Structures are given as structure tokens and as C-alpha cells.
Amino acid sequence: MIATNNIFNIRVGKQPWFGQVGTKKGFVEFETREHAIRAWLVLMRTYRRQYQRYTIRDIVGRFAPPNENDTAAYVRYCAQQLCYSAHSPLRLAQDYCRLGVAMAWMETATKLTADDIYEVMKKYNIFIV
């Protein structure tokens, strides 16, 4: 199931997201895909700055916990797509853009490009590193 434009399957939180137009079965519905990408970028920035999640394993482990996902397979897939070890820290904006491509595919089989994510990153000035 994919809630409207929620290409990362972002769950409803305490505060509504920018561009949130509703909810569906515990997931956010976004006005546009761009809003979903923006929300994912904000989450990634929060993971890095507040929770010190720097590696694919740490990020995916928090985003897609084992009680809801095959987290180990998810981590392997993302690491393969980035050609990184699951334990290597992400250091560049490009790394996060590529991770977003892999995560959107894992979550909803949505095909994004790193440029799709980078354009939203620039537009809203959401730089993670």
C-alpha cells in the first residue's frame, strides 16, 4: 500500500509535515512527491544530527526496523546500490541522494534519480552533511 505520494512510506508523526494533506492507515499523504522527498531529507538530517546515524546500517535500521521489515535485506540492498559497506559512514550529499533512490525503490518500487533528490535538497536548502 502506498499513501498518496508517500514514496518513502513515512509514518504519521507528532507534527504534520510540510505538504501533508492527510493520512491513510498510519502513513502520511503528501500533496506531491516533492513533499515526500523533502520530508525524507528532513528525517535523514535529523537521523544524522540528533541520533548520530551515519552508516547505511544505522540509518536503515532506524527507518525500517526489524519488527516491520527484513532490515538485513534492506541494508544489503542499499549498500549494494551505493557500492559501500553497510558500515561505511555517508559523507557527501551525493551519498544521501543515492541512498534515497535505493530506499524509495525498497519502500514503494518508485524509480527516482539522485538528481530528483538533489533538486529538492537545493530548493529547500536541506543539506545533511
Language model region names:
Residues M1-V129:
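Cell-wall polysaccharide-cleaving catalytic domain and substrate-binding groove, primarily
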